[in-house]
């Protein structure tokens, strides 16, 4: 299937959803997914939800807010309290699962409050082979993964993003700040803040 055929599949899948809440981090994948959802469904049927937390870089939250403002997207920022999740501070190997499960539960509730049928996230085909405990939470909570369903990989998403005029097409991938610490090293808000400030220099 060609890259443009895959995009047509993505568009149709999004149309079939009727309405969607996109988990929006301002990264390459979620920005592309949000743009595709807006094209498929229109602004009235799409909301973007971004988590504000000590493990999410401040500059990414700012970029997410700016993108939604520029594109007229309803943007809801929810407070994620991952450090309050039992076990998270100890930085176990399933850290991403714990965080994503809490986050997607919150996004699911926000979707219901706004009469939105589906929650969607931006994982792609390249994520299938990696160790991604967060995808277990996605499956458990019935969150949609439209980019994987359309069999789009990262390079194809970058190419289509460029065609759509998205400035994120060549944006560097990033992971949450908690990933800077080896498994088993205790995570604190102070440590995460230090990392965020250091990486913004």
Each predicted region: which residue ranges?
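Mid-to-C-terminal catalytic subdomains of enzymes
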Residues: 121, 151-201
């Amino acid at each position: 299937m060609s890259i443009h055929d895959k995009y047509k599949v993505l568009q149709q899948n999004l149309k079939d959803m009727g309405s969607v809440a996109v988990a929006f981090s301002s990264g390459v994948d979620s920005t592309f997914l949000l743009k595709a959802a807006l094209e498929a469904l229109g602004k009235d049927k799409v909301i973007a939800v971004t988590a504000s937390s000590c493990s999410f870089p401040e500059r990414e939250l700012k970029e997410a807010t700016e993108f939604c403002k520029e594109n007229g997207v309803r943007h809801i920022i929810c407070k994620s309290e991952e450090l309050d999740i039992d076990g998270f501070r100890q930085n176990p190997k399933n850290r991403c699962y714990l965080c994503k499960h809490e986050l997607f539960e919150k996004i699911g509730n926000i979707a219901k409050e706004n009469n939105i049928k589906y929650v969607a996230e931006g994982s792609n085909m390249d994520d299938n082979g990696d160790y991604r405990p967060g995808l277990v939470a996605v499956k458990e909570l019935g969150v949609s993964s439209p980019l994987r369903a359309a069999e789009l990989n990262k390079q194809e998403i970058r190419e289509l993003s460029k065609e759509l005029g998205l400035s994120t097409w060549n944006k560097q991938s990033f992971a949450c700040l908690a990933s800077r610490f080896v498994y088993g090293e205790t995570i604190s808000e102070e440590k995460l803040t230090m990392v965020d400030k250091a990486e913004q220099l």
